[in-house]
């Protein structure tokens, strides 16, 4: 009975992860397509749409790399002990996750600079050059990625030496745990940047509401609504990214347990929620994407009713 219950829970968790991955692919492909079609129609693309498109493309690549890793672990687990396979999987995961997270961080920075109002000279200079700020942020992130790749490369080489000296599944698990630990450390950099944007947005909103109160003006003006929308976008990223980072950290701590246990599947389940859930939150929070999604849903409903009417 206990075995049956464990098997049912395991199947449920695996099904949940699979559903999250499918939603992640669909949501991110949708975001990319909407922005590409709009770009073709208008002949130009805004800075924020570029960020959305870059985020969607990198997220799609990230989810595909996760799916590839899961399939290899399921179909040919022995290959995970091969050095070149470990290098390919870790590098693809690292690069795609890096751009996925940093594009989301750039989105937080963009909203912060566009929405908030501070009289500081440095802030005003950054506000007028928001595109350059985003570009510089991405360049800095490339330097961080380079360091991250070097660190992983060094430890992958050490792992290959250990594999020659003593083989076994424990070595593969330790290498995986070490990779997760390194990834967790590097995730705190963009997380800290987004958290800073979040706190400054709250401070800016508080100042704005205080000014509105002194002037005896309604609190639901354009600036207030913009602040709240910006906060919603950043909060969605922070909450889901916190869950993602905690998932990575927890997996690195529980790495001595077998990969087939329920805890491992549960941690993967909550970790995969980040690239899927955040993209869905972006669709709901962006007027253009939300309208496009409603149009698609309406079209699918009409298509379904038309098919039903033509049925036997």
Curated annotation (Swiss-Prot):
Q: Which UniProt keywords apply?
A: G-protein coupled receptor, Glycoprotein, Membrane, Receptor, Sensory transduction, Taste, Transducer, Transmembrane, Transmembrane helix
Q: How does it sit in the membrane?
A: Multi-pass membrane protein
Instruction: Give the principal location in a single coarse category.
Output: membrane
- Location relative to the cell: Membrane
Which Pfam families is this protein grouped with? TAS2R
Please verify whether the record's keywords include ATP-binding.
Answer: no
Q: Where are the transmembrane segments?
A: 17-37, 66-86, 93-113, 134-154, 185-205, 230-250, 265-285
Q: Name one GO molecular function term.
A: bitter taste receptor activity
Topology, Cytoplasmic side: 38-65, 114-133, 206-229, 286-312
One of this protein's GO BP terms? Answer: detection of chemical stimulus involved in sensory perception of bitter taste
The record places the following residue ranges in the Extracellular compartment, namely 1-16, 87-92, 155-184, 251-264
Report the CDD domains cross-referenced here.
Answer: 7tm_TAS2R14-like (cd15019)
What PANTHER family is this protein classified in? TASTE RECEPTOR TYPE 2 (PTHR11394), TASTE RECEPTOR TYPE 2 MEMBER 103 (PTHR11394:SF75)
Q: What does this protein do?
A: Gustducin-coupled receptor implicated in the perception of bitter compounds in the oral cavity and the gastrointestinal tract. Signals through PLCB2 and the calcium-regulated cation channel TRPM5.
Q: What else is known?
A: Several bitter taste receptors with distinct ligand specificities are expressed in a single taste receptor cell.
Family stated for the protein in its record:
Belongs to the G-protein coupled receptor T2R family.
What's this protein's name? Taste receptor type 2 member 103
């Amino acid at each position: 009975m206990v075995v049956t219950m464990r098997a049912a829970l395991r199947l449920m968790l695996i099904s949940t992860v699979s559903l999250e991955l499918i939603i992640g692919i669909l949501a991110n492909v949708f975001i990319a397509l909407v922005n590409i079609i709009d770009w073709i129609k208008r002949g130009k693309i805004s800075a924020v749409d570029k960020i959305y498109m870059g985020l969607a493309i990198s997220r799609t690549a990230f989810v595909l790399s996760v799916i590839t890793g899961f399939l290899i672990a399921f179909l040919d687990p022995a290959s995970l002990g091969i050095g070149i396979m470990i290098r390919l999987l870790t590098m693809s995961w690292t690069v795609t996750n890096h751009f996925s997270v940093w594009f989301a961080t750039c989105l937080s920075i963009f909203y912060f600079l566009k929405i908030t109002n501070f009289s500081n000279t440095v802030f005003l200079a950054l506000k007028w050059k928001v595109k350059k700020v985003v570009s510089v942020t991405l360049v800095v992130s490339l330097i961080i990625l380079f360091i991250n790749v070097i660190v992983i490369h060094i430890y992958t080489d050490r792992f290959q030496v250990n594999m020659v000296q003593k083989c076994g599944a424990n070595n593969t698990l330790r290498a995986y745990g070490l990779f997760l630990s390194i990834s967790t450390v590097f995730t705190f950099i963009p997380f800290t940047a987004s958290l800073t944007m979040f706190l400054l947005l709250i401070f800016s909103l508080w100042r704005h509401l205080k000014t509105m109160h002194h002037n005896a003006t309604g609190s639901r003006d354009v600036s207030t609504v913009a602040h709240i929308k910006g906060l919603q976008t950043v909060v969605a990223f922070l909450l889901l990214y916190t869950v993602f980072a905690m998932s990575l950290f927890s997996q690195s701590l529980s790495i001595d347990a077998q990969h087939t246990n329920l805890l491992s599947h549960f941690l993967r389940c909550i970790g995969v929620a980040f690239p899927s859930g955040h993209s869905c939150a972006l669709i709901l929070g962006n007027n253009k994407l939300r309208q496009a999604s409603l149009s698609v849903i309406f079209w699918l409903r009409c298509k379904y009713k038309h098919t039903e009417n033509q049925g036997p």
